[in-house]
Amino acid sequence: VFALEKMGMEAADKIMAVSNLTRNIVINKYGIDPSKVVAVHNAVDFDEFKQMEVKRGVDDKIVTFLGRITYQKGPEYFIEAAYKVLQKCSNVRFVMAGNGDLMNRSIRRVAKLGIADKFHFTGFLRGDDVKKMFAYSDVYIMPSVSEPFGISPLEAMKSNVPSIISKQSGVAEVLSYAIKTDFWDIDAMADAIYGLLNYPALASMSARCGVEEVNNLKWENA
Protein backbone atom coordinates (compact mmCIF):
# COMPACT_ATOMS: atom_id res chain seq x y z
CA VAL A 1 0.00 0.00 0.00
CA PHE A 2 2.82 2.40 0.87
CA ALA A 3 4.39 1.99 -2.58
CA LEU A 4 1.08 2.69 -4.32
CA GLU A 5 0.40 5.76 -2.17
CA LYS A 6 3.89 7.09 -2.82
CA MET A 7 3.56 6.49 -6.58
CA GLY A 8 0.22 8.29 -6.67
CA MET A 9 1.51 11.28 -4.73
CA GLU A 10 4.64 11.55 -6.85
CA ALA A 11 2.47 11.61 -9.98
CA ALA A 12 0.11 14.27 -8.59
CA ASP A 13 0.50 17.95 -9.44
CA LYS A 14 -0.81 19.03 -6.05
CA ILE A 15 -1.64 17.20 -2.81
CA MET A 16 -4.16 18.51 -0.29
CA ALA A 17 -3.64 17.33 3.29
CA VAL A 18 -6.35 17.80 5.94
CA SER A 19 -3.86 19.25 8.44
CA ASN A 20 -0.25 20.30 8.85
CA LEU A 21 0.22 17.10 10.83
CA THR A 22 -0.76 15.09 7.75
CA ARG A 23 1.23 17.39 5.45
CA ASN A 24 4.39 16.69 7.45
CA ILE A 25 3.77 12.94 7.25
CA VAL A 26 3.38 13.15 3.46
CA ILE A 27 6.61 15.13 3.17
CA ASN A 28 8.76 13.25 5.68
CA LYS A 29 7.48 9.69 5.37
CA TYR A 30 6.80 9.62 1.63
CA GLY A 31 9.56 12.02 0.56
CA ILE A 32 7.21 14.29 -1.40
CA ASP A 33 8.34 17.75 -2.52
CA PRO A 34 7.01 20.21 0.12
CA SER A 35 6.10 22.77 -2.55
CA LYS A 36 3.34 20.52 -3.91
CA VAL A 37 1.74 19.65 -0.55
CA VAL A 38 -0.75 22.10 0.98
CA ALA A 39 -2.81 21.83 4.17
CA VAL A 40 -6.55 22.54 3.88
CA HIS A 41 -8.28 21.98 7.20
CA ASN A 42 -11.62 20.20 7.28
CA ALA A 43 -14.81 22.04 8.12
CA VAL A 44 -18.33 20.89 8.94
CA ASP A 45 -21.61 22.02 7.40
CA PHE A 46 -23.78 22.72 10.42
CA ASP A 47 -26.74 24.19 8.49
CA GLU A 48 -28.89 21.15 9.26
CA PHE A 49 -27.31 20.38 12.62
CA LYS A 50 -29.87 20.56 15.40
CA GLN A 51 -29.13 19.96 19.05
CA MET A 52 -31.25 17.40 20.81
CA GLU A 53 -33.02 17.83 24.12
CA VAL A 54 -32.93 14.73 26.30
CA LYS A 55 -34.06 13.72 29.76
CA ARG A 56 -31.32 12.07 31.76
CA GLY A 57 -32.17 9.16 34.01
CA VAL A 58 -29.15 9.67 36.28
CA ASP A 59 -27.67 12.60 38.16
CA ASP A 60 -24.10 11.52 37.42
CA LYS A 61 -21.98 13.56 35.02
CA ILE A 62 -21.22 11.81 31.72
CA VAL A 63 -17.85 11.71 29.93
CA THR A 64 -17.95 10.37 26.38
CA PHE A 65 -15.49 8.76 23.98
CA LEU A 66 -16.99 8.40 20.50
CA GLY A 67 -15.10 6.63 17.74
CA ARG A 68 -13.66 3.34 16.58
CA ILE A 69 -12.37 1.24 19.46
CA THR A 70 -9.00 0.60 17.86
CA TYR A 71 -5.39 1.47 18.70
CA GLN A 72 -5.31 4.70 16.66
CA LYS A 73 -8.16 6.22 18.70
CA GLY A 74 -6.51 5.62 22.09
CA PRO A 75 -9.36 3.86 23.95
CA GLU A 76 -6.96 2.38 26.53
CA TYR A 77 -5.85 5.86 27.59
CA PHE A 78 -9.48 6.89 28.04
CA ILE A 79 -10.05 3.88 30.31
CA GLU A 80 -6.96 4.56 32.43
CA ALA A 81 -7.90 8.25 32.78
CA ALA A 82 -11.43 7.22 33.77
CA TYR A 83 -10.03 5.04 36.54
CA LYS A 84 -7.98 7.95 37.90
CA VAL A 85 -10.97 10.32 37.86
CA LEU A 86 -13.14 7.78 39.68
CA GLN A 87 -10.60 7.65 42.50
CA LYS A 88 -11.42 11.31 43.20
CA CYS A 89 -15.12 11.60 42.41
CA SER A 90 -17.87 9.00 42.18
CA ASN A 91 -20.67 11.03 40.60
CA VAL A 92 -19.48 10.42 37.04
CA ARG A 93 -20.03 7.78 34.37
CA PHE A 94 -17.88 7.06 31.35
CA VAL A 95 -19.30 6.06 27.97
CA MET A 96 -17.38 4.42 25.15
CA ALA A 97 -19.51 4.77 22.02
CA GLY A 98 -18.24 2.79 19.07
CA ASN A 99 -17.00 -0.58 17.95
CA GLY A 100 -13.69 -2.06 16.90
CA ASP A 101 -11.04 -4.71 17.35
CA LEU A 102 -10.16 -3.55 20.89
CA MET A 103 -13.73 -3.74 22.20
CA ASN A 104 -13.35 -7.04 24.09
CA ARG A 105 -9.95 -6.06 25.43
CA SER A 106 -11.40 -2.75 26.64
CA ILE A 107 -14.30 -4.50 28.38
CA ARG A 108 -11.86 -6.83 30.14
CA ARG A 109 -9.66 -3.93 31.27
CA VAL A 110 -12.65 -2.03 32.68
CA ALA A 111 -13.69 -5.14 34.61
CA LYS A 112 -10.16 -5.70 35.92
CA LEU A 113 -9.99 -2.11 37.18
CA GLY A 114 -13.29 -2.61 39.02
CA ILE A 115 -15.10 0.29 37.34
CA ALA A 116 -17.64 -1.66 35.25
CA ASP A 117 -20.55 -0.13 37.21
CA LYS A 118 -19.41 3.33 36.07
CA PHE A 119 -18.44 2.45 32.50
CA HIS A 120 -20.80 1.83 29.60
CA PHE A 121 -20.24 0.46 26.09
CA THR A 122 -22.96 1.50 23.61
CA GLY A 123 -21.68 -0.13 20.43
CA PHE A 124 -21.67 1.71 17.10
CA LEU A 125 -23.78 4.89 16.92
CA ARG A 126 -24.87 6.91 13.90
CA GLY A 127 -27.13 9.83 12.94
CA ASP A 128 -29.51 11.00 15.65
CA ASP A 129 -28.02 8.55 18.15
CA VAL A 130 -24.73 10.46 17.93
CA LYS A 131 -26.51 13.77 18.54
CA LYS A 132 -28.38 12.21 21.45
CA MET A 133 -25.12 10.97 22.95
CA PHE A 134 -23.65 14.46 22.77
CA ALA A 135 -26.81 15.84 24.39
CA TYR A 136 -26.27 13.48 27.33
CA SER A 137 -22.58 14.35 27.65
CA ASP A 138 -20.90 16.78 30.04
CA VAL A 139 -17.42 16.22 28.59
CA TYR A 140 -16.21 14.77 25.28
CA ILE A 141 -12.73 13.32 24.88
CA MET A 142 -10.71 12.27 21.83
CA PRO A 143 -7.41 10.71 23.04
CA SER A 144 -6.22 9.66 19.58
CA VAL A 145 -2.69 8.32 19.18
CA SER A 146 -2.70 9.71 15.64
CA GLU A 147 -5.53 11.56 13.92
CA PRO A 148 -5.18 13.20 10.48
CA PHE A 149 -7.90 15.66 11.51
CA GLY A 150 -10.92 14.56 13.61
CA ILE A 151 -14.49 15.76 13.01
CA SER A 152 -16.12 14.49 16.23
CA PRO A 153 -14.70 17.26 18.47
CA LEU A 154 -16.30 19.85 16.18
CA GLU A 155 -19.66 18.10 16.49
CA ALA A 156 -19.29 17.84 20.26
CA MET A 157 -18.37 21.50 20.66
CA LYS A 158 -21.24 22.52 18.40
CA SER A 159 -23.43 20.62 20.88
CA ASN A 160 -22.11 22.77 23.77
CA VAL A 161 -19.96 19.95 25.12
CA PRO A 162 -16.56 20.97 26.56
CA SER A 163 -13.94 18.87 24.80
CA ILE A 164 -10.52 17.38 25.45
CA ILE A 165 -8.40 16.32 22.47
CA SER A 166 -4.94 14.86 21.96
CA LYS A 167 -2.14 17.10 20.76
CA GLN A 168 -1.43 14.38 18.18
CA SER A 169 -4.49 15.31 16.10
CA GLY A 170 -4.88 17.59 13.11
CA VAL A 171 -7.94 19.28 14.62
CA ALA A 172 -5.75 20.53 17.49
CA GLU A 173 -4.32 22.99 14.95
CA VAL A 174 -7.63 24.85 14.61
CA LEU A 175 -9.19 24.59 18.09
CA SER A 176 -8.14 27.02 20.79
CA TYR A 177 -10.95 26.25 23.24
CA ALA A 178 -10.56 22.48 23.43
CA ILE A 179 -8.22 21.32 26.18
CA LYS A 180 -5.21 19.55 24.67
CA THR A 181 -3.11 16.81 26.24
CA ASP A 182 -0.62 14.27 24.93
CA PHE A 183 -2.49 11.02 24.23
CA TRP A 184 -0.20 9.09 26.57
CA ASP A 185 -0.46 11.54 29.48
CA ILE A 186 -3.32 9.97 31.42
CA ASP A 187 -2.59 12.15 34.47
CA ALA A 188 -3.10 15.35 32.46
CA MET A 189 -6.14 13.81 30.78
CA ALA A 190 -7.66 12.86 34.13
CA ASP A 191 -6.94 16.33 35.54
CA ALA A 192 -8.63 17.95 32.52
CA ILE A 193 -11.71 15.75 32.92
CA TYR A 194 -11.85 16.44 36.66
CA GLY A 195 -11.51 20.18 36.09
CA LEU A 196 -14.33 20.36 33.56
CA LEU A 197 -16.60 18.28 35.80
CA ASN A 198 -15.94 20.18 39.01
CA TYR A 199 -15.35 23.78 37.97
CA PRO A 200 -18.56 25.09 36.34
CA ALA A 201 -16.96 28.36 35.22
CA LEU A 202 -14.29 26.47 33.27
CA ALA A 203 -16.85 24.16 31.66
CA SER A 204 -19.17 27.06 30.81
CA MET A 205 -16.39 29.11 29.18
CA SER A 206 -15.13 26.09 27.25
CA ALA A 207 -18.62 25.29 25.96
CA ARG A 208 -19.55 28.88 25.08
CA CYS A 209 -16.28 29.74 23.35
CA GLY A 210 -16.18 26.33 21.69
CA VAL A 211 -19.51 26.91 19.94
CA GLU A 212 -18.33 30.28 18.66
CA GLU A 213 -15.08 28.77 17.46
CA VAL A 214 -16.57 25.88 15.48
CA ASN A 215 -19.17 28.20 13.95
CA ASN A 216 -16.27 30.02 12.29
CA LEU A 217 -14.73 26.86 10.85
CA LYS A 218 -16.39 27.18 7.46
CA TRP A 219 -15.24 25.71 4.17
CA GLU A 220 -14.69 29.18 2.73
CA ASN A 221 -12.17 29.81 5.53
CA ALA A 222 -10.41 26.44 5.23
Annotate each predicted stretch with a short phrase:
Residues 124-125, 132-137:
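Short alpha-helical donor nucleotide-sugar binding micro-motif in glycosyltransferases
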Residues 21, 43:
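Carbohydrate-associated surface elements
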Residues 162-165:
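Short hydrophobic beta-strand element within catalytic cores of glycosyltransferases
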Residues 178-187, 195-200:
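Conserved acidic donor-binding segment of nucleotide-sugar-dependent glycosyltransferases
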Residues 145:
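Aromatic "clamp/platform" in nucleotide-sugar-dependent glycosyltransferases that forms part
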Residues 2-15:
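Membrane-proximal helix-turn-helix segments that form the acceptor-binding/catalytic region
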Residues 16, 57-82, 95, 207:
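Conserved donor-binding/catalytic core segment of Leloir-type glycosyltransferases
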Residues 107-125:
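Nucleotide-activated donor-binding/catalytic signature segment of Leloir-type glycosyltransferases, i.e.
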